Structure formats: C-alpha cells, structure tokens
Amino acid sequence: MNMVGYAGVKTGVPYPVLARASFGIWGANIPALVRAVVACFWYGAQTAAASGAIVALLIRTQWFADFNASTHFLGHTGLEVICFVVIWGLQLLIIQNGMETVRRFQDWAGPAVWVMMLILAIYLCVKSGRFAFTSDIPMDVLLDKTKDAGVPGTPGSWTSLFAVAAIWVTYFSALYLNFCDFARYAPDKASLRKGNIWGLPINLILFSLVAGVTTIAAFDVYGEVLLHPDQISAKFDSWFLAALAALTFAVATLGINVVANFVSPAFDFSNVFPRQIDFKKGGYIAAVIALLLYPFAPWEGSAASFVNIIGATMGPIFGVMMVDYYLIRKGEVDVEALYREDGEFRFQGGWHVNAFIAAGIGAIFSSILPNFTNWLPSWWGVYGWFFGVAIAGIIYYVLRTAALGAGARTAKA
C-alpha cells in the first residue's frame, strides 16, 4: 500500500493516469478497465451481501417473513429486491458530493463498526460465561466451515498459516492498484505511513481477535460456528441486538464497497472517456452495471470464478507499474506528460508493448495456468498473485532496460 501510496502522494494522480507511465497513454485504459470490471462485479456482490443482512433482520417480523415468502420477481424474493435497491440507493447518496463525502462516511463507518462489534463480543462473552481465545470447536466442524476457503494444509499447520497469510495479502490486491486514488489526498508520506500502519496491521489484527472471540463465544452459547454477524443476529431473542448485528455487517460491507468497488471504476471509466464522463458519472455507470447484474446474481454462480481469474491479472499489472515507477524511473514522473497524447508516454502509438508482454506472461502464471491446467502444483493458485507480480516485474525490467539501452546506443550513433 505504501509503495503505491507514495506514488499517489508525489504525483497527485489517480490510478488510471499513473498507469499511463508504464502502459502508455492509451494502453492504460486496459488495466483501468480490468480493475473496473472486477469492481462492478463485486459492487453488486457486496450490495447483495449488505441487503441480505437487512433481510435477515426484517424476517424476524411475521409480516416481512410472509411478504418474503409470498413475493418473487427478478429471480429473488420481493423483500430481497427492495432491500437491494434501498442499499444500492444509499451508496449513491454517499458519493453525491464526490470524494469528500466518501471520506466523511469512512470517518463515521469505521468507528461505528468497531463499537458494534465490541458490543456483540461483550454480550456473547457475558452470556457464555467466559472470555477466551481458545475454542472447543471440533476439528471436523472447522474443516467443514473452511472447506470453500481454498486453504491447503491442515488447520494450524505452517502450510495453512502461510496460505492464509498469502490470501490476506491477495485480498487487498485490487486496492494495491488504485490506492493512489486515495493517497493523492494525503498531505505527505509520513501521514500516509501512519494511516496505513494503524489502518492495516494494527486494525486488522485487533479486529480479527475481536471477531475470533465473538465466534468462539457464539459457539459456546449456540453450539454452532457462526461466521457472520447476520448469522449471529438470527439467534438473538432481543430485536435490538439482532438489529445491531445486522447493521454491523451492513455498514462494514458498505464501507468496503464504497472504497474498493465504487471509487475505482468511477476514476477508471472517466479515464477511458474523459470528455464525456467525470468522477460522479463514472460511479453511476458502475452502480447501474451492478444493478443490471442483480437479476442474474452472477456472484452466486460460476461467473465468480471468471471474475477472480480476471482479478488475478492485477498482480502482473501491479508488478509492471511498481518496477517502472521505482526501478526504471526512480520515482520521477513527468506528470504533465501523463496528460499529453504526443509526449513521453506515447510509446508505440499510445501503447507500451513491452508492458503488455510482461503483464501477459505474468497473467499466464498467476491466472491461466493455475485455473485451466494441471501443469502447476495445487498450491500454486494460492500464491498466484505473488508469482504474477514477480514474473511480470522481472520480465518488464529486462525488456525495458534493454529498450532503453538500445535507444541510448542509437542516440550515440
């Protein structure tokens, strides 16, 4: 995050513009659209998840339960559709005034989720009669609950520990690309570092501990492994606590969605058509695409694998951009040239062929081979993002330095 963030602080440009330095003034539209496609898909998926938490809360009331059971359209129940549209609309309100509204929402949403999670944890610990970081959950139950996580090895082994760490790092792969969309507003690098330290390792570790304590206490109380606040809320006798749990999940999901899946495509679409689309219109396009996808609910089927395969190409793109910025350009970019069609970043007609060669080869090893062949070890896919970054970065460095060397020799001649 800091590597991309420093570039954002120094240049003050969003991700699709920074990508022009390595992929070309027109070629940068491809990595921008890759990020936008994945974001639109998950925008719909996260909106559906947040609305699902509200549905789980409302059907505790008999009238809503009857309505949910008796009405169906667009492949969903009537209540699911209404809640999805409401959550979808709320997200549009959040970005009404651009990035400033997003910042204000995050300032409120982050602490609110923490408060609600602590209340849930304290309530369940009191009800279970203990506060514990260790659990009596049977191993076969844990294995059943985590069978779809794609983590190789036995739970608790070094193999599974490294795999989980890799998955956590890869989880943020989309934000690694477009973090400069946010970092460009930071006053300096020191502020960026401080924010990332508190927001990522410290916040993530502490929140994981609270979530673990909550899950353990919920198992002690209800005899089930409940991994989501909306699942816990379904067990509460108190409507207030049920609402608290549902809102925790909904607000947390909205917070992630607005940052990870709204801001990025807003900038990406506006970059592709800068004269016709501004930030707000780009965000609206992403929201409409997510809404149109809802009747098909592709996130519930095999299409999710397709989008994950596309998402795996983010590693090679990241590798190319970081090698170009830090190793080739030494952190120095002519920002004005990023906005000129005939400047330094025109390369081959606006496309930097070497960058696409490197990213393409990296994508073969990070995405295509692990998902469509059995030529690689079964564990390769878990670390695919890392292989993509390394392979694409190395190839790009070799190709770019060779091209620069050839150019220098030609100039001397």
Label every model-predicted segment.
Residues 5-9, 22, 30, 56, ...:
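Membrane-water interface regions at transmembrane-helix termini and the short interhelical loops
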Residues 34, 45, 51, 82-127, ...:
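Membrane-interface loop-to-helix entry segments
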Residues 83-87, 123-128, 140-214, 237-259, ...:
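Hydrophobic, membrane-embedded alpha-helices of multi-pass small-molecule transporters
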Residues 97-110, 157, 174-206, 224-228, ...:
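Hydrophobic, small-residue-rich membrane helices and short re-entrant helix-turn-helix hairpins
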Residues 318-398, 402, 409-412:
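C-terminal membrane-solvent junction of multi-pass transporters and transport-like membrane proteins
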Residues 1, 34-46, 111-127, 167-174, ...:
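Selective recognition of specific alpha-helical transmembrane segments in multi-pass small-molecule
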Residues 47, 51-60, 112-148, 171, ...:
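Hydrophobic alpha-helical segments and their helix-loop junctions in multi-pass secondary transporters
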Residues 1-22, 35-38, 44-47, 214-218, ...:
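Juxtamembrane transmembrane-helix boundary signature
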